[in-house]
């Protein structure tokens, strides 16, 4: 673990005497498909701890990472190079003690409490074990006797399905979108658990990101631009064929840039369809493609999630932050988020 350096001895306010962050990849410091001690120190939770001048212990992961982050977006080279191990494990603790960043990459709305028996409980992936050591996020949080808590959870309830282009749960392809009823149960269990921690004096609940605005999804219509098409083909490692019937300049579909990697690896044919092909199920045109109807479904689900989170923040006396207006503004500015990934 590591303690964030602070300039003064005391926090800016007693409210921040002990700050704990609960969440998933973004909170943990996961970047570029990997995580290590450098990316962990760039987490917004670490930056916030510095702003309020409070000690903040993070469960450091040795370089090159677990897994190592991508060092080159085009070639997909990893930090540490071709010989890098898939996981360099946790760093040794100089001074054992409670951790303040209990977030785990891949966590869903169920994860902080792990209250329901099943595969999505205490042990979801190796990082769950390395970071939490067999406990839940809430249990680990309570050990730090937090006075202030931030919670950003729920993105993974919709992200994987949005990026795969398949909204129903489909083994080997998509985790599916968590139903609003299930999300409600999970989140209320989390709030109930937070209310049971007597040291908490305040906090903030952060809303779920509308995943149609994530930078890795780009407008399929851009592929009609030869420059964009050339850049995509370079990433795919071959000249791809654009289906003229579904990929017209007027299409509103979104494409996950990971489609290029799937084509390069041979997992997807070098033909791009921008709309779903006929049922019962045709992966081409479905996988990695989010059409107009799917975008509406995702947006409606996220809106329902966030209405619940805002209401639960009120019951706790916490602040609620909706990240979507700021993220949408960033994506609308090509100087901040390029229309096509680069």
Model regions and ranges:
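Loop/turn elements at helix/coil->beta-strand transitions in domains of secreted/extracellular proteins
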Residues: 15-18, 56, 144-149, 197-203, ...
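Short, solvent-exposed loop/turn and secondary-structure capping segments
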Residues: 30-35, 60, 160-165, 214-219, ...
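Catalytic nucleophile-elbow at a beta strand-turn-alpha helix junction centered on a G-D-S/GDSL motif
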Residues: 19-33
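Conserved SGNH/GDSL esterase-like catalytic core that processes O-acyl groups on lipids
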Residues: 35-189
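Mobile gating loops/cap/lid regions near enzyme active sites that modulate substrate access
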Residues: 217-300, 304-342
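Bacterial Sec-dependent N-terminal signal peptides
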Residues: 1-17
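Active-site-proximal beta-strand/loop segments in catalytic clefts of secreted hydrolases
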Residues: 22-25, 151-156, 163-164, 206-210, ...
């Amino acid at each position: 673990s590591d303690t964030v350096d602070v300039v003064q001895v005391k926090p800016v306010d007693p409210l921040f005497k002990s700050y704990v962050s609960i969440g998933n990849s973004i909170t943990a410091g996961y970047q570029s498909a990997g995580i290590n001690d450098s990316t962990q120190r760039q987490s917004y939770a670490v930056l916030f701890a510095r702003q309020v001048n409070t000690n903040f212990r993070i469960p450091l992961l040795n370089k090159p990472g677990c897994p190592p982050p991508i060092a080159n977006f085009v070639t997909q080279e990893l930090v540490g190079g071709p010989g890098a191990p898939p996981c360099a494990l946790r760093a040794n603790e100089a001074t054992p003690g409670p951790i303040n960043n209990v977030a785990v990459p891949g966590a869903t709305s169920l994860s902080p409490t792990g209250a329901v028996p099943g595969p999505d409980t205490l042990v979801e992936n190796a990082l769950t074990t390395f970071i939490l050591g067999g406990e839940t996020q809430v249990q680990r949080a309570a050990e730090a006797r937090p006075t202030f808590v931030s919670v950003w959870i729920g993105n993974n309830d919709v992200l994987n399905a949005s990026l795969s282009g398949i909204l129903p749960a489909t083994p080997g392809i998509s985790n599916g979108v968590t139903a609003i009823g299930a999300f409600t149960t999970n989140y209320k269990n989390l709030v109930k658990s937070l209310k049971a921690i007597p040291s908490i004096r305040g906090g903030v609940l952060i809303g779920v990101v509308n995943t149609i605005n994530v930078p890795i999804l780009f407008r399929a219509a851009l592929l009609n631009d030869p420059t964009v098409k050339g850049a995509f083909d370079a990433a795919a490692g071959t000249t791809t064929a654009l289906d003229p019937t579904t990929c017209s300049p007027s299409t509103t579909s979104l494409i996950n840039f990971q489609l290029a990697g799937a084509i390069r690896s041979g997992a997807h044919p070098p033909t791009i369809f921008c709309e779903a092909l006929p049922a019962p199920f045709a992966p081409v045109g479905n996988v990695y493609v989010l059409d107009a109807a799917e975008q509406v479904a995702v947006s409606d689900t996220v809106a329902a999630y966030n209405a619940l989170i805002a209401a639960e923040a009120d019951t706790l006396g916490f602040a609620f932050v909706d990240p979507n207006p700021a993220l949408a503004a960033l994506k609308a500015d090509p100087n901040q988020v390029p229309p096509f990934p680069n």
